[in-house]
């Protein structure tokens, strides 16, 4: 169990490192751009192909760094971006897609001179298993409140 918590903490640290690196390099954005993202990712009908997700994630990080989005909003919209079936819950596949998306986003970011983050698939599967332990109602999904109130996310 300690190994899984450490793995979870490393995954979260990697995600937050990407967020911090992206936020530090971005310029101030207009509040109306934040409102547009809020509207887009709160909508029921969302187009979620990888290219759009990458662009929107980069914009969210930029807006969070500029103070137009709070860190809680950033977490929430990142959660929503990966809720592909719009059931307000993440299953194991959606969590794995979120981790792979974060990994691919880091690898595509060659202009900042950093070494790409490579997360072995086995570690991502272990991460998903550890997150599913936060499933309070044992329905096989993680809701946003379950994720945010779990012991794992309190380590962020």
UniProtKB/Swiss-Prot annotation:
Position of the signal peptide: 1-21
Deleted gene: phenotype: RNAi-mediated knockdown results in impaired blood feeding of ticks on a vertebrate host. Impaired development of a blood pool, an accumulation of blood and tissue fluid formed at the tick's feeding site. Massive infiltration of host inflammatory cells at the bite site. Increased expression of host cytokines, such as IL5, TNF/TNF-alpha, PTGS2/COX2 and CCL12/MCP5. No significant effects on tick activity and health during the incubation period. No significant effects on tick attachment to a host.
Residues annotated as domain EF-hand: 70-105, 123-156
Upregulation: Up-regulated after blood feeding. The highest expression is observed at 96 hours after feeding and in fully engorged adult ticks.
Location(s), subcellular: Secreted; Cytoplasm
Main location: secreted
Regulation of its activity: Resistant to inhibition by host SERPINE1. Inhibited by PMSF, aprotinin, antipain and leupeptin. Inhibited by Zn(2+).
Gene3D superfamilies given in the database record: EF-hand
Alphabetized GO MF terms: calcium ion binding; serine-type peptidase activity
Residue numbers binding Ca(2+) 1: 83, 85, 87, 89, 94
pH dependence of this protein's activity: Optimum pH is 7.0.
Protein name from the UniProt record: Longistatin
Gene designation: A01M12
